[in-house]
Swiss-Prot record:
Pfam families: tRNA-synt_2, tRNA_anti-codon. Belongs to the class-II aminoacyl-tRNA synthetase family. The keyword Transferase does not apply. GO terms for molecular function: ATP binding; catalytic activity, acting on a protein; lysine-tRNA ligase activity; magnesium ion binding; transferase activity; tRNA binding. The gene is lysS. Homodimer. It comes from Clostridium perfringens (strain SM101 / Type A). SUPFAM superfamilies: Class II aaRS and biotin synthetases (SSF55681), Nucleic acid-binding proteins (SSF50249). Disulfide bonds: none annotated. InterPro entries: Aa-tRNA-synt_II (IPR004364), aa-tRNA-synth_II (IPR006195), aa-tRNA-synth_II/BPL/LPL (IPR045864), Lys-tRNA-ligase_II (IPR002313), Lys-tRNA-ligase_II_N (IPR044136), Lys-tRNA-synth_II_C (IPR018149), NA-bd_OB-fold (IPR012340), NA-bd_OB_tRNA (IPR004365). It catalyses: tRNA(Lys) + L-lysine + ATP = L-lysyl-tRNA(Lys) + AMP + diphosphate. This is Lysine--tRNA ligase.
Length: 501
């Protein structure tokens, strides 16, 4: 026996009784000249929704539908079956008088999960259900693996994410979530396009991981013999386009961060960044709150949504609060009274705050930010802009007018979670280089999420970038709120998973 024959034999031994039976049925179909995998195209005339929505017009007329067989009922001379397609389900009525004895017998051998095309007359049953009185049918794909029985969606979350296609087949709510995701993305693009923004594409592979404080994925380009990074943000390339003279640009796409997995984080995620020349962070607040309101109205019909039992009101304007005021409100510490790094370090020690570098190297602004994260972040339930971040943690941002300890930066929070980040963009190349050099020192202290110096970006900035506002939004997190999904994995079709052994 050859190795190939041994492998086939071992694979067959691992098949369940149901799978073996289905494969036997396939062989019988093929021997009878009815191989379902020889079907190349189906001339469907209507979807299930078309038939139901236009019943009065279609009653008594012939239609052809196609979909997955989800249930069969009845024996004898009549069989009822449910056929599922993307919009929903349609009931088939298969009677011996309409299809013949042999055809009815053949239909009874079909398994749940098989794909079927059926032609027949539209009518209503005595129970008032819109159905199709089948006159002919064809098996167009044989399902060799049975669907789990008595499902209302997978119970094991790990299996749901690994077998998303089966999850969608058996759980209409999951399918609806991803249809809504597509509608949300479309509405975001529509809003920006209507405001004159130009959608662009920038590299996913780059020699520098720039534009955000995050740990990157590293890969190797064989032909160039250099290490490259999967992008952690689109920021620096998009700013170079502002330098080039494009006044309003945006990009929606995948970013990658080599960090932990949680209900809020997936290493591969969808984000949008937009940049507008001659604008500042106040303009970005206006864009953010009005864009989300537009999307909510477009997709849900209201600016109010319910998330995990709490009503979230996205109606503009959102609340604005400075980081200093938030720390005073939620941690009871007035940073207007803190005059030195040493005073801030003493507070950090008292509060047991942890940093990625020695405490004596930590600045007042870094302590302020950490206090907000520890005491204030989870308190911002309704949509809120947290404004004016310390300069130490905002290396790509202009200093605040009137207070150079802070920057014109905000982050948007909903239900205690960050959903966006925006700046009045730093366009002074001399100051920008100084900020990057400080970030390089942070990396020396052990902060592997500190920004890298990008000389190509610096060259562009030296060419001249006008005053610019920039905004970045985590699409997956916004979709979580608009679909009432508790985990980011519930809104990503195929989330990152550890391979099964």
């Amino acid at each position: 026996m050859s190795n190939e024959e041994i492998n086939i034999h071992e694979a067959e031994e691992q098949l369940s009784e149901q799978e073996m039976l289905r494969r036997q049925k396939l062989v019988e179909l093929q021997e009878a000249g009815k191989d379902p995998f020889d079907v190349y195209k189906v001339e469907r005339t209507h979807s299930s929704a078309d038939v139901k929505d236009n019943f009065e017009e279609l009653e008594g007329k012939e239609v052809k539908v196609a979909g997955r067989l989800m249930s069969k009922r009845g024996q004898g001379k009549v069989v009822f079956a449910d056929l599922a397609d993307l919009p929903g389900k349609i009931q088939l009525f298969i009677k011996i008088d309409n299809v013949g004895e042999e055809a009815l017998k053949e239909f009874k051998t079909f398994d749940l999960g098989d794909w079927v095309a059926a032609t027949g007359e539209v009518f209503k049953t005595k129970m008032g259900e819109v159905s199709i009185k089948v006159t002919s049918f064809e098996l167009i794909c044989k399902s060799l693996k049975p669907l789990p029985e008595k499902w209302h969606g997978l119970k094991d979350p790990d299996l749901r994410y690994r077998q998303r296609e089966v999850d969608i087949i058996t759980n209409p709510e999951v399918k609806d979530t991803f249809i809504k995701r597509s509608q949300i993305v479309k509405a975001i693009r529509e809003f920006l396009d209507n405001r004159g923004f130009l959608e662009v594409d920038t590299p996913i592979l780059s020699p520098i991981a720039g534009g955000a404080a995050a740990r990157p994925f590293i890969t190797h380009h064989n032909a160039l013999d250099i290490d490259m990074y999967l992008r952690i943000a689109t920021e620096l390339y998009l700013k170079r386009l502002i330098v080039a003279g494009f006044e309003k640009v945006y990009e929606m796409g995948k970013n990658f961060r080599n960090e932990g997995v949680s209900v809020r984080h997936n290493p591969e995620f969808t984000a949008i960044e937009l940049y507008e020349a001659y604008a500042d962070y106040n303009d970005m607040m206006e864009i953010m709150e009005n864009m989300i309101a537009y999307v909510c109205e477009k997709v849900n019909g209201s600016t109010k949504v319910t998330y995990e039992g709490t009503e979230i009101d996205f109606t503009p304007p959102w609340r604005r609060i400075t980081m200093v005021d938030a720390v005073k409100e939620f941690a009871g510490i007035d940073f207007n009274e803190i005059k030195s790094d040493e005073e801030a370090q003493a507070i950090a020690k008292e509060k047991n705050l942890e940093f990625p570098k020695p405490l004596d190297k930590v600045t007042k602004g870094e302590v302020l930010n950490m206090l907000f994260e520890e005491y204030g972040e989870d308190k911002l339930i309704q949509p809120t802009f947290l404004v004016d971040y310390p300069v130490e943690i905002s290396p790509l941002t202009k200093k605040k007018r009137g207070n150079e300890m802070f920057t014109e930066r905000f982050e948007g929070f909903v239900y205690g979670r960050e959903v966006c980040n925006a700046y009045s963009e730093l366009n002074d190349p001399i100051v920008q280089r100084e900020r990057f050099e400080q970030q390089a020192r942070e990396r020396e202290y052990g902060d592997d999420e500190a920004y890298m110096l990008d000389e190509e970006f610096m060259s562009a900035l030296e060419t001249g970038m006008p005053p610019t506002g920039g905004l970045g939004i985590g699409i997956d997190r916004m979709i979580m709120f608009l679909t009432d999904s508790s985990s980011i994995r519930d809104v990503i079709l195929f989330p990152t998973m550890k391979p099964q052994k």
